C-alpha cells in the first residue's frame, strides 16, 4: 500500500516537472520510479527520451530558418529511448501517442521532415483530445502542431498548381494557429496550477515557482501565423490574429510576447490602415478589404474549431476602440506600461545586453506614441509619456530630444529649454539644437540673455557650414534687436541696434538666398528709420519669397512711412488675398483705411474681422450680430484649430514682438482681469488666451476708429466689449482715458491713464496722453519727467518729442524745445501708419 502511495506521489511530481519543463529533475525521479514500480520501464524510456531531447534543445536552441542538425550522439541516445518505449508497446495509448509526438519532434530536429509528417498522420493529430488532460500534454500537442507547420513549410510541393500552393499555405497557417491557441491554453492552465499549488502549500517552505519559458516551438506557434498572413498579403487576417492573441487572458510567460504583438499591431494600424478600412475588434472582419492582396482570395474567418480554447477577457464594461488611432494608442499605452515595469536600468557590464534590449524596446514604443499622439495634437499627453521614458534616457540623445520637442509642442517652453541643454551636452556638434533653444528663449519666455548665449553657440558650431552660421547670426541679430526694444536707456538702445544690424548683415552675406536674412535686415533698418535702405532689402526678400506675409507687411509699412498710404493699402490687400485670416495684417489695414479711405471702410474691416474670428473659432450661431456679450455666451475655442491660424502674440496692439515689460504687464493684466471677472461674475473664457486677446484687440481698434470720428457712445460700447474679456488690460484703460478726453472729462481721463501706467509703466501712449493733461493743468515739471521717460522707452515716437517740445516751450526753454520739435518733424516724416515693431521678430 505504501509502495502504491509512493508511486502515486512520484507520478504526480513527474507530471508537475513535465508541465513546468523542469527537465533536469526528470532522470532522478525516473530512478526512484523504476526502483519502486518495476512495470514502469517503458514509461522511464519515454521520460528519459523526452528529458534528454529537451535538455539538448535547451543547450542548442533552434533558430527559424536554420539548417537541420542531423544525427548527433545526444540525439541518437534520445532515439534509442523513444524506440524502446514504442517497440515494446506496453504503454497506455495516451503515452504511446506522446512517444510518437516526441519522436516526430526528434525527426524534425534531425531534418527528417517527411517521417515527422508520417508520424503525425498515423497518430491522428487533429483527433487528440484537449479536455481532461494534464497541462504538459497540451504543451506536447501545441508543439506538435507547430512542428507540423514547420515541416510543411520545409517540404517542396510536388505539383506547381497554384491551388495546391494556396491549400498548402492555408494548411501551414492553420497548424500554426492551432499551435498558438493550444499554447495559450497550456500557459493559462500551468499558471493556474502553479498558483493553486502555492496557495495550498503548507507553511513549510517548498521549491520556488519555476519561470516558464516558451521555447522555440511554442514561440513559433504563437508568432508565425500572422507573419505568414502579412507575407501573403492578407492584412485583415493578420490583424485579426493579433487581436485574438491579445484578447487571451495574460500569463507571466506571455507578457513579453504581448508587448511585442501590441507594438507590432499598433505600427500596422498607424502605418498601414486608414480610418475607412478599419473595423473594431468586436466586429466581424470585412469579406473584402482594400488592405488585402486582390489576387489572393480566401475567407477572413477561422477554418477550424477546437474542443477547448484559451480564456479571453470579457465583461460588460470592457473598452472597445472605434478607430485605428484610438486602438493604436491603447495598445501603445499598454506596451509602455509593460516596458516601464520590466525596464533594465542597471549600468553594470553584465546587464549591458539586457539594458540595450530594454532601451530599444521602449524607444520603439515611444516613437510610435509620438506618431499616434502627434496625429491628434495631444502634445501634453505625449510630453507626460516621454517624461516617464526618462528612466531609460541616461546618455540617450534620441529620448532627450523627443522629450524636448514634445515639451515645445505642448507649450512648456521653460522645461523644453532645460531639456535642450542636456541635448546640447550629448550632441555638441549639432547646430539645430541650440538654434531651437534660442527660438524658444526669444519667444514667449523672453529670456534674451539665454537666447544670446544659444545664438553664439550656433555661430561657433556652424563654423563648418555657412548655412548654420548664417542662422546663428540671424538668431543673434534678433536677440540684439529685442534687447534694444527692451533697453530703458536711449544710448544702450542705439548700441544694441547697431549690433543687431551688423549681425543681420553678416547673416545676409553668408546666406544671400535666405529670404529671412534679407527680411530681418530690412526690418532692423526700418526700426532704425533708414527707410530707403530697408526698401531695397525688403524687395530682395520678396524676390526670394514672393508670398511671405511678413515681407509684404513690412513693404506696406515702409510705403506708409513715405506717406504712400494708397500703395501701402494695396500691398496689404494683396497679402490678405493669400492670408485672409492674418489678424496682424488686418489691424494694419484698419489704420491705413482710417488714414486714406475714411472711418466707414475701417469699421467695415473691423466687422469683417469679427466674422473671421467667429468662423475661426466655431460660433454655434454664425448669423449672430457680433455684439460682444453674445459672442462670449456662444464661443467655443477649438484647440486644434488654434494652431493653424495666424494670431498676434502680444498684449499691446502697437507691438508684435514680446517685450520684457509687456510680458510682465500681460501677467499682471491677466491676474487682475481674472479677479475682476470673478467679482463681476462675467462669463469664463474657454481655451487658450490668444483668441480672446485677438477679439479684445478687434474691439479696441473699432473703438479707436469711433474716437477718431468723435463718437464717444459707440467707442464706449466697443471698449466695454474688450473690458468684458480683459477688464484690467492697460489697453482697455488707455482707451477709456481717450473716451473721457473726447467727452472733455480731463480728471477722469487722467485717472484712467494713471491706472493703465500702474499696470504697464512703459506704455508710451498712456505716458504721452497723461503728460498732455498735466501740461494743460500747468504741472510742467511732472509732465516733462513723464515725457523724458517715454523718450527713453521709445526714442522714435514723434508725438512724445512734440509733447516734450511743448512742455519745454511752456517752461521758457526755447532752445531745447526747438530741438525737440525738429526731432519730432524728422521722425514724423519717416513714421509708418503702424509701428514697425508690430511685425513679429521670431526665428
From Swiss-Prot:
Q: Which UniProt keywords apply?
A: Cell membrane, Cytoplasm, Membrane, Phosphoprotein, Repeat, TPR repeat
What SUPFAM superfamilies has UniProt attached to this entry?
A: TPR-like
Question: What is an annotated GO biological process for this record, any one?
Answer: phosphatidylinositol phosphate biosynthetic process
- Keyword Ribonucleoprotein (UniProt): no
The family database entries (PROSITE patterns) matched by this protein are listed as: TPR, TPR_REGION
Q: Where are the TPR repeats?
A: 97-131, 219-252, 363-396, 397-430, 479-514, 516-548, 549-582, 696-729, 730-763, 765-797, 798-831
Sites of Phosphoserine modification: 160, 202, 625, 629-630, 673, 677-678, 681
Instruction: Provide GO CC annotations from the record.
Output: cytosol; plasma membrane
**Superkingdom of origin organism:** Eukaryota
Q: What's this chain's function? A: Component of a complex required to localize phosphatidylinositol 4-kinase (PI4K) to the plasma membrane. The complex acts as a regulator of phosphatidylinositol 4-phosphate (PtdIns(4)P) synthesis. In the complex, plays a central role in bridging PI4KA to EFR3B and HYCC1, via direct interactions.
Quaternary structure annotation from Swiss-Prot or TrEMBL:
Component of a phosphatidylinositol 4-kinase (PI4K) complex, composed of PI4KA, EFR3 (EFR3A or EFR3B), TTC7 (TTC7A or TTC7B) and HYCC (HYCC1 or HYCC2). Interacts with PI4KA, interaction is direct. Interacts with EFR3 (EFR3A or EFR3B), interaction is direct. Interacts with HYCC (HYCC1 or HYCC2), interaction is direct. Association with the PI4K complex is strongly reduced by TMEM150A.
Name of the protein in question:
Tetratricopeptide repeat protein 7B
- Provide the species name: Homo sapiens (Human)
